[in-house]
Amino acid sequence: MSETENQRARIKGVFSSEKSVKVGAGATLRRTMQTMYWFADEDEQGVITIQPLNPNYVPSGPKQEIPKEEFLENYAPEPEFYSSKVYPSIRKLNQTIAKAERHRVNGDTYSAEYEFGNALRVDEENIRANFGLGLTYLERGETGKADNIFQRLIKMEATFEAEHKHLFNDFGINLRKNEMYDQAVEYYAKALELSPADENLHYNMARACFAKADIEKTIEHLRTALSLNNNLEIAKKFLEYLRKNKLLPQTLSGAEPKVSN
């Protein structure tokens, strides 16, 4: 089978599943069939993930992997439902978010806030919209509102997925710029739970710890970053800064990697 045929064979679209649920109580108790709609996507390795559709016909909430055999047996394709309801809703949502992002980039933060709010009314768990609204608040210095978004983002694992890396980095930097150091530490700690071998996360955590005057943790994360990538110049320069300012413990001051010329 050719690569093109392989791509065409992958599962992607809206599917439905049915399950029997109890309705009522006592003498009125009965069973009925409940239909659920899902957005399914199969990756290059053949792993299928499903995500429920919310009442506004957009995929929302946590994704879950499902064995292919179970999927094929219990989920039915709904191409007409996708074309008539889901695709138009997803397209409109993405257009709203794109419009909001343009406003934010252009410095029109109040229009950005309005459009991100519109997007979140359609999908309150949309990662791009939550990041965008949070960044809008941070850029305005509205730390109270930004903290509300932070508390929402920190609970959603999709926040830390690779596809959102650029937004993730911007948000972390802006937390520090707004002196929200406790949130920045919690933010990077959550990310490190999911990606413990990411040297850049350890470096950013070191920056956040240093802002909190936690030198011990700063050094710990810098050393971890360099153990993962000994060529990480920004981490070497940070250690050199600590050394020059006599912030390294005496036992470590001569043992750290030197900054290369």
Positions of the model-derived regions?
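Long, contiguous interaction/recruitment modules in multidomain scaffold/adaptor proteins
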Residues: 1-101, 105-118, 122, 145
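Position-specific recognition of the canonical hydrophobic site in helix A of tetratricopeptide repeat
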Residues: 104, 138, 169, 173-176, ...
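Helix-start (N-cap) detector for alpha-helical repeat units in TPR-like alpha-solenoids
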Residues: 93, 127-128, 161-165, 199-200, ...
